[in-house]
Swiss-Prot record:
Composition skew (Basic and acidic residues), residue ranges: 716-726
Organism expressing this protein natively: Mus musculus
Lineage: Eukaryota, Metazoa, Chordata, Craniata, Vertebrata
Keywords associated with the record: Activator, Coiled coil, Differentiation, DNA-binding, Nucleus, Phosphoprotein, Transcription, Transcription regulation
Assigned GO CC terms: nucleus; transcription regulator complex
Signal sequence bounds: none
Modified residues (Phosphothreonine): T131, T372
Function: Transcription factor involved in chondrocytes differentiation and cartilage formation. Specifically binds the 5'-AACAAT-3' DNA motif present in enhancers and super-enhancers and promotes expression of genes important for chondrogenesis, including cartilage matrix protein-coding genes, such as COL2A1 and AGC1.
Induction note: Expression is dependent on SOX9.
Identification of the protein by name: Transcription factor SOX-5
């Protein structure tokens, strides 16, 4: 890129000598040339000359183009210094054309320039001087010295001039770079609108991030609050449970304290009253009754038993009955009434054949005297209350005859057997219970002794045989009646045909009544059947007559009404809460609840009834309701409806009540039996003393003419109870008619157990 400016000047000087005449020159001219060269050398020493080497990359460019920037640079650098320099520069510019014509202007190295200069110098000197050898040698020496000086100057000035060129080049490069950078920076910087848009986007992103952060903080706070509330709820629940446990513990402690107080009061009453507890024989013992009694804490050790005359095979388990138990059973009685009641009981117990209260010797242990016919009652599901004798006194059975019967139903569903009367003596009974209650010193005749083991065993065997025979005949009779009803009642509906069938049924029952007329009250020791002990009612059998359809015709149930829809779930709930509750009691509860409901509460169940009726009609379009005949029962060969049977039972109970009230008019003023013992259902599971002679019927002993005293145990409140039961059956009658399990069971007793229980008590 850089060229040497001195070589053209040298060529210029050489070429300036070419116009000399070929005819030669004088010595003066040579001297002028040499002096001029010296002056130029001195000027060149004073002013720095630029020695720019030729560059290879410019071989094809014209010489004027190469040296144009150099001349400009020399003008700028030198400035207005001397006219000689200006003259030299102008001379250089003026001789550019000549130098461009030189054949050596394209040389690219200093050696070529020197060779060219030497050749030209030689040619010029030889041509111009034309002198002898002396002049030639001096001119060559001058040229050589000039060349050497020029070379030295070039070598000397090159390191000084190069930095200035580099500075110029670097300045140019910086300017170009700045120009290019400024353009690129403008492109990168962009317009103000784009910057504002980007700023808006950044602000939007910042706002979004801020809102997201706030949301996260709010959610975190909510979670903290929720966790705190849950912890607070758990703490409150734990505190509530703890309080409930503490309350339950306090209640249990209070119950224990009350129980302890009751025990203390019982002991005080026993000590202060000096009243010996009752002693009631149990005839024969039942393991279930003993277990139930043991749970209540009233059972003595099993070894504590007696044998009347060493011949009674049935030991007596003794259970205490105290005034506290009586007070618990009858909270309405005061202390004075309790004293009177116990006085009456002891008076009934302490009647002796000789008129003495406690004066009989100990040797008469075998003579157990009962003022009434000695009987027992066996309950299948309930423990009879039994009392013990005082430990201080021996078991003086003759001084304290057993007159009170043990019967305490534990549940309203437990059927009761009639009493078995065993009389092995010859003397008839001369006095009754009212007489015994009236005076402790009343005399009664002995009716029998329990010292004949053979007689007792024989009576038991006869009772078992007759009961088994009656059961077999009853089964055969039931089969015949069922066949007759299924054949006849499905086809004949006239009164004449019904009368014929009823007479046939009565004839089938005559044999049973003739063969077992005195065995109605016989106790069944093997099975817990329900046997009526009255003379007029023998083995009442309640059954259902068959429907008015063929045996192969499938039974279509009626659609449930609103009450049945409601009672279905309610009955299930009650059974879950009380699994042992009887169906009749559940029906009473449901009936009373349904009556108490308002029409608004019943509305959804009526809607369900309409839906079920529509669905039933779509499923069975030809369905016709055929009501089954009313329930009937056989009483003494007569077929009676349930209402008639209940009316007969009610009348008989009323008669027995009147009979007992007439005999009790002259007695001591104590509470009636119905008040002392409210009812069989209310007394369920409560051990308490009883009045003598609970059950009685026509005796199955060899003396059928013996008078019988009836008790009014559970008499009060029976008629309202029966009315409520009939009413409940009227309400819920459809429920019982729709259950197939009741239809398929031929032995099911459709009278409620509470009805049978009342009937058994009255008879």
């Amino acid at each position: 890129m850089l060229t040497d400016p001195d070589l053209p000047q040298e060529f210029e000087r050489m070429s300036s000598k070419r116009p000399a005449s070929p005819y030669g020159e004088t010595d003066g001219e040579v001297a002028m040339v040499t002096s001029r060269q010296k002056v130029e050398e001195e000027e060149s020493e004073r002013l720095p000359a630029f020695h720019l080497p030729l560059h290879v990359s410019f071989p094809n460019k014209p010489h004027s183009e190469e040296f144009q920037p150099v001349s400009l640079l020399t003008q700028e650098t030198c400035g207005p210094r001397t006219p000689t320099v200006q003259h030299n520069t102008m001379e250089v510019d003026g001789n550019k054309v000549m130098s461009s014509l030189s054949p050596y202007n394209s040389s690219t190295s200093p050696q070529k320039a020197e060779e060219g200069g030497r050749q030209s110098g030689e040619s010029v000197s030889s041509a111009a001087l034309g002198t002898p050898e002396r002049r030639k040698g001096s001119l060559a020496d001058v040229v050589d010295t000039l060349k050497q000086r020029k070379m030295e100057e070039l070598i000397k000035n090159e390191p000084e001039d190069t930095p200035s060129i580099e500075k110029l080049l670097s300045k140019d490069w910086k300017d170009k770079l700045l120009a290019m950078g400024s353009g690129n920076f403008g492109e990168i910087k962009g317009t103000p609108e784009s910057l504002a848009e980007k700023e808006r986007q950044l602000m939007g992103m910042i706002n979004q991030l801020t809102s997201l952060r706030e949301q996260l903080l709010a959610a975190h706070d909510e979670q903290k609050k929720l966790a705190a509330s849950q912890i607070e709820k758990q703490r409150q629940q734990m505190e509530l449970a703890k309080q409930q446990q503490e309350q339950i513990a306090r209640q249990q402690q209070q119950l224990l304290q009350q129980q302890h107080k009751i025990n203390l009061l019982q002991q005080q009453i026993q000590v202060q009253g000096q009243l010996p507890p009752l002693m009631i024989p149990v005839f024969p013992p039942d393991q279930r009754t003993l277990a139930a009694a043991a749970q209540q804490g009233f059972l003595l050790p099993p070894g504590f038993s007696y044998k009347a005359g060493c011949s009674d095979p049935y030991p007596v388990q003794l259970i205490p009955t105290t005034m506290a138990a009586a007070a618990a059973a009858t909270p309405g009685l005061g202390p004075l009434q309790l004293q009177q009641f116990y006085a009456a009981q002891l008076a009934a117990m302490q009647v002796s054949p000789g008129g003495k209260l406690l004066g009989l010797p100990q040797g008469n242990l075998g003579a157990a005297v009962s003022p009434t016919s000695i009987h027992t009652d066996k309950s299948t599901n309930s423990p009879p209350p039994k009392s013990k004798d005082e430990v201080a006194q021996p078991l003086n059975l003759s001084a304290k005859p057993k007159t009170s019967d043990g019967k305490s139903p534990a549940s309203p569903t437990s059927p009761h057997m009639p009493a078995l009367r065993i009389n092995s003596g010859a003397g008839p009974l001369k006095a009754s219970v009212p007489a015994a209650l009236a005076s402790p010193s009343a005399r009664v005749s002995t009716i029998g002794y329990l010292n004949d083991h053979d007689a007792v065993t024989k009576a038991i065997q006869e009772a078992r045989q007759m009961k088994e025979q009656l059961r077999r005949e009853q089964q055969a009779l039931d089969g015949k009646v069922a066949v007759v009803n299924s054949i006849g009642l499905s086809n004949c509906r006239t009164e004449k045909e019904k009368t014929t069938l009823e007479s046939l049924t009565q004839q089938l029952a005559v044999k049973q009544n003739e063969e077992g007329k005195f065995s109605h009250g016989m106790m069944d020791f093997n099975m817990s059947g329900d046997s009526d002990g009255s003379a007029g009612v023998s083995e009442s059998r309640i059954y259902r007559e068959s429907r008015g359809r063929g045996s192969n015709e499938p039974h279509i149930k009626r659609p449930m009404n609103a009450f049945m829809v409601w009672a279905k779930d309610e009955r299930r709930k009650i059974l879950q809460a009380f699994p042992d509750m009887h169906n009749s009691n559940i029906s009473k509860i449901l009936g009373s609840r349904w009556k108490a409901m308002t029409n608004l509460e019943k509305q959804p169940y009526y809607e369900e009834q309409a839906r079920l009726s529509k669905q039933h009609l779509e499923k069975y379009p030809d369905y016709k309701y055929k009501p089954r005949p009313k329930r009937t029962c056989l009483v003494d060969g007569k077929k009676l409806r349930i209402g008639e049977y209940k009316a007969i039972m009610r009348n008989r109970r009323q008669e027995m009540r009147q009979y007992f009230n007439v005999g009790q008019q002259a007695q001591i003023p104590i509470a009636t039996a119905g008040v002392v013992y409210p009812s069989a259902i209310a007394m369920a599971g409560m051990p308490s003393p009883h009045l003598p002679s609970e059950h009685s019927s026509v005796s199955s002993s060899p003396e059928p003419g013996m008078p019988v005293i009836q008790s009014t145990y559970g008499a009060k409140g029976e008629e309202p109870h029966i009315k409520e039961e009939i009413q409940a059956e009227d309400i819920n009658g459809e429920i019982y008619e729709e259950y197939d399990e009741e239809e398929e069971d031929p032995d099911v007793d459709y009278g409620s157990d509470s009805e049978n229980h009342i009937a058994g008590q009255a008879n």
